[in-house]
């Protein structure tokens, strides 16, 4: 019996190009973690609650600007749910606004990353995040 030591990553982002860039960055950075995708906060909560994503070793990469339920609304709902409140979340957004950062950290996010414009910078960002999360899981 083998033990799955990979972190299951849920990308919550409505922008098709950003989703494609994350997938490409995973491939280019040789990141083998399972990647799930939700279009918005409502879909993400449904996936987390219905078992679509294993409960152990999961990380949410969260955009802030989305329809139906934005990232901050998602964080509030997530932290209010006893079954989900401990889920690790890293904000991955184009917003460099201090107000957005403060509001996200108010909901105990593990990090706040601004999406780089250049693809190679994006690959480096995803690879670094993967290394960091792997080290944190080993601790």
Please report, for each region that a protein language model flagged, where it lies by residue.
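Active-site residues of response regulator receiver
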Residues: 62-63, 93
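Non-catalytic signal-transmission and effector/linker regions of two-component phosphorelay proteins
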Residues: 1-10, 16-34, 49, 53-56, ...
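Conserved Asp/Asn-Gly motif in the active-site loop of CheY-like receiver
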Residues: 38-42
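Conserved active-site segment of CheY-like receiver
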Residues: 14, 91-96, 116
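Receiver (REC) domain active-site loop signature in two-component systems and cognate sites
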Residues: 66
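Conserved phosphotransfer cores of two-component systems
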Residues: 51-55, 79-86, 107
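Short, glycine/charged-rich "phosphate-handling" switch motifs in NTP-dependent
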Residues: 110
């Amino acid at each position: 019996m083998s033990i799955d030591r990979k972190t299951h990553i849920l990308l919550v982002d409505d922008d098709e190009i950003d989703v494609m860039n994350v997938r490409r960055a995973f491939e280019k950075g040789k990141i083998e973690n399972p990647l799930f995708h939700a279009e918005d906060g409502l879909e993400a909560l449904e996936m987390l609650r219905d078992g679509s994503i294993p409960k152990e070793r999961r990380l949410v990469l969260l955009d802030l600007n989305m329809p139906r339920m934005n990232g901050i609304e998602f964080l509030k709902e997530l932290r209010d749910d006893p079954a989900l409140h401990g889920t690790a979340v890293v904000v991955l957004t184009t917003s460099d606004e201090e107000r957005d950062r403060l509001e996200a950290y108010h909901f105990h996010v593990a990090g706040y990353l601004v999406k780089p414009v250049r693809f190679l910078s994006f690959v480096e960002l995803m690879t670094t995040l993967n290394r960091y999360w792997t080290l944190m899981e080993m601790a």
